[in-house]
Amino acid sequence: VPTPSAARGIIESIYYHPGLKWHIDKIYVMNPIRFTSIRRNEVKNKISANKIMKEANGKGASYIDRKKDIEQRATMMLRNVHYIIEAHFEMTDQANESDNPGKFQDIITRRLRKGQGRYQPYLGTRECTAHFGLWEGGRIPTISETRDLGYMLYDLDFSDPNDIQPMFFRAKLENGVLDLTDCEVVK
């Protein structure tokens, strides 16, 4: 189940404006929670700026040594996920005079119906792209699972830019719904 901040990130990838702030109300889990394991070959080192400068000046060639610079990583990930995110927004003091909730709602609805966003959202890593649309099907058919998911990241507290703090909450899935409307957030 995505964290509330990840769900907000997905929504902001569809529509972001400094004049509004998103709040996640509920996350509906549509498909059973299932895991799969994958292995990936990844480059373990980045090329340094010095190597790039030497190559640009014709004093060397950069390459990746297959034996030294590539490592295999195992990942346990969710598979066949399907969520519905219920959210609302509030206007902020950065909204322009011409901004209003109706205008934002129309833009968001249009983008959701067309599957358009600012950039392609993803779940966890960019290889796990998220596809989205507007739910207009009435009752949401969630899984019938109730499970305590433990403490989960809620968001980051940016109120003090010199001391950004994580905020957590006790995540409880009730009949396939993670309800965030009245959860207790702790630092």
What are these regions (language model features)?
Residues 1-44:
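Long, hydrophobic N-terminal alpha-helical segment
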Residues 42-44, 52-187:
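Internal, well-folded beta-alpha domain core
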